[in-house]
């Protein structure tokens, strides 16, 4: 499924990174992901980012340790630097099984952070004269109504603002997270973040890119003035995007 105006991938030889999300959700997708990893390993990439949801939110998958351990082993096959963003299926949605989402997030950090600790999922680095930043913003209304949301979003918004200040003297800012903040409910868990993104679009027009997953609909568009949004493929499609490291010309 496509939405917006998808851009062509950068030509071979152009410095690039890989991004994917919302997979694998089945054993079929596990096999397809292995083949996709082989494909990425055959290319020169600065790094690879998975924007979260590495299984369904069932006890047999992303809410269970065994599935997460298998994904840890699978992702270890990626020869490039690999960054994983937490998705709602791995922690915040696990309340439907009577599990503590904060405990599940701690387990995720233990397995997937290089140095486990509070907020270790928030990473930031500079490549190609752009600042890249990861945010823990899960889908399914951002875990709205749970007491963890307020403190987490305070950290998220501070981290994003610090990153934006760094990016002002560079070519741009790339934000990577799981949730699609433009899919709103009557009680909106993304309102304050969306306002912050709108302000960044005004402040750095054409220099801010948001990459997310969540709604499994491939998009490349401008949902807010000055903000480019890329949504990656998701289950049942097991695909990745090759994106240029350097900022594209203003669209």
PLM features per residue range, with description:
Residues 10-11, 38-47, 76-77, 126, ...:
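His/acidic metal-ligating clusters that form di-metal
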Residues 23, 88, 138, 179, ...:
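Residue-level signal for short, function-critical loop segments
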